[in-house]
Amino acid sequence: MILLKLYLTLAAILCQSRGMTSLDLDDLMTTNPEIQNEIINKHNDLRRTVDPPAKNMLKMSWDNIIAESAKRAALRCNYKEHTSIAERTIGGVVCGENHFMSSNPRTWSSSIQSWFDERNSFMFGFGPTIPGVMVGHYTQVVWYKSYKVGCAINLCPAQSLKYFQVCQYCPGGNVAGRKYEPYTIGEPCAACPKDCDNGLCTNPCAYNDDYTSCPDLTKQVGCNHPVTANCKASCQCTTEIQ
């Protein structure tokens, strides 16, 4: 009888525990400020832990306009393709995009951690250590220049993986030419000693260069030359992270 009572007590505790930890779509909606904070804090916590360390890693913040764009992407229920560049260009800035699909709802922290865990198959400056393995979600999560993020979730009942989570990052990462160097190696905040929050830089550049050659161009001909008219970041941001 004692064993039976003990068993029933344990079963009740387990059921309550499962009930408390179960999730539904409403629990993950990113219109909830608590969910927004969870997403931002998770990203920033992970960005602080990159190995090798980053000297120029920007601190991320939530952006509602980007979240609306991510929502439109999630509503498409298209797991296989990112939204077009035109659709994820916000305020003239091309944003990056990560997808996570699951058969059961997962916390945002869990999904973001899954993206970050691609680092286990990634070597800085080299890329995937296993041919064909995915590492682009990781490099986007830790792309130094991406400092605004917005995310959304949608239920896609026609799919076996029916929970579809999307995050968009601005400016986008995985830039050609340095895709496998998502940041500059160095002592945390070495590039922003006066604008640092626990290892993350807080001085993003509000402008963008239209050409990857802009830093060299501005050094050669200066910022008053017509050829550097589209090099606003290199010309306007002398102390900010760009």
Swiss-Prot record:
Q: InterPro entries annotated for this entry?
A: Allrgn_V5/Tpx1_CS, CAP_dom, CAP_sf, Crisp-like_dom, CRISP-related, Cysteine_rich_secretory, SCP_CRISP, ShKT_dom
To which species is this protein native?
Varanus varius
Q: What are this entry's molecular-function GO terms?
A: calcium channel regulator activity; potassium channel regulator activity; toxin activity
| Chief localisation class | secreted
Which cysteines does the record link by disulfide bonds? 77-156, 95-170, 151-167, 189-196, 192-201, 205-237, 214-231, 223-235
**SMART domains, sorted:** SCP
Q: Which residues form the ShKT domain?
A: 205-237
Quote the function comment for this protein.
Answer: Blocks ryanodine receptors, and potassium channels.
Q: Which GO terms describe its cellular component?
A: extracellular region
Localization per record = Secreted
Q: Which Pfam families match?
A: CAP, Crisp
User: Is Ribosomal protein one of the keywords?
Assistant: no
Its domain of life?
Answer: Eukaryota
The segment(s) forming the SCP domain are 41-169
- What keywords tag this UniProt record? Calcium channel impairing toxin, Disulfide bond, Ion channel impairing toxin, Neurotoxin, Potassium channel impairing toxin, Secreted, Signal, Toxin
Name of the protein: Cysteine-rich venom protein VAR11
- Could you tell me in which tissues this protein is expressed? Expressed by the venom gland.
Q: Which CDD domains match?
A: CAP_CRISP
What is the residue range of the signal peptide feature? Answer: 1-19
Similarity comment: family membership: Belongs to the CRISP family.
Query: Is the keyword Nucleotide-binding in the record?
Result: no
